[in-house]
Amino acid sequence: MFNKDNLWTMDQIGFVFLPDSKPDTWRIIDPTTDTEVGEYYELDATVYTYADSTPDDKNEIIGAFQMFQDRPEYSVYRAHKLIHGLNTDSFSTLDDASDLYDTLIAGCAIMLYGEEYGLKRADSFLRWIRNTDFYQAPASAKYHDAFEGGLLKHSLDVAYHITDLLQLESFSTVNIASCILVALTHDLCKIGLYKPYLKNVKSEETGQWKKERAYTYNDANIPLGHGAASLYITQKFFHLSLEEALAIRWHMGRWNMCDGEVGEYHVAVKKYPLVYMLLFADQLSIKEY
């Protein structure tokens, strides 16, 4: 029996356990059985113990998606291997990371809409996103992943975590393609949101002043609010199910939520597992606020 004092809960659907014996790791707890499930999450985002190696061919994700209906456990395993070690440091260039993102988008579209139409949807989306700053943008101005390529890294990290949650019985029936698609598109509202500049920083070691890259905010391109803006963009390219749409809409949870939205949010979380999965995976990928 785990010590409940060491549990961190989100809406009483899933838990994260921080064991005293390994202070640098998290484990997921299934609240229905009070047992430990899943693998260790290293707080250093460059290391995941579930996948034993990086993929030989990133394009294998398409085959994995096509096999999902007959062998979901294989597809989940392949997704883990393909999304393993998702820190921009693990890629020689940001182009390598963007290639993986593109491949995952194509794989999701193929499974959800069929090969011919799915590839058309993916191609339309990727043509658009390549003309934005998505692959170079930070995920925040000064908190999590606040560096060039941070938004891309964060999106891939969320995809890793959300596929891991498929191992929980409560989430095992959710379509893996839906999981990865919402993970990769949940923060599209951040495109064009951060403006780079150089700021003067005093070195603690030398006492000398130097210029470092930093970010400030631009006005929101789509002033609908975080989740709603990402949903608005995603629906321009993909025909989302209600569950997929709600997952993107409510992935910020109760953060900055007005009183009138609380009831709708709780209904969405209760009825649609993917809503909670994206919220939880997003939080697992963030190390600082």
PLM region spans:
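All-alpha helical catalytic cores of prenyl diphosphate-utilizing isoprenoid enzymes
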Residues: 124-131, 144-156
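Non-catalytic interface/linker regions that flank or bridge core catalytic/transmembrane domains
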Residues: 68-137
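Acidic, low-complexity, intrinsically disordered interaction modules
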Residues: 18-63, 67, 74, 78
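Negatively charged, low-complexity tracts enriched in Asp/Glu with abundant Ser/Thr
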Residues: 2-10
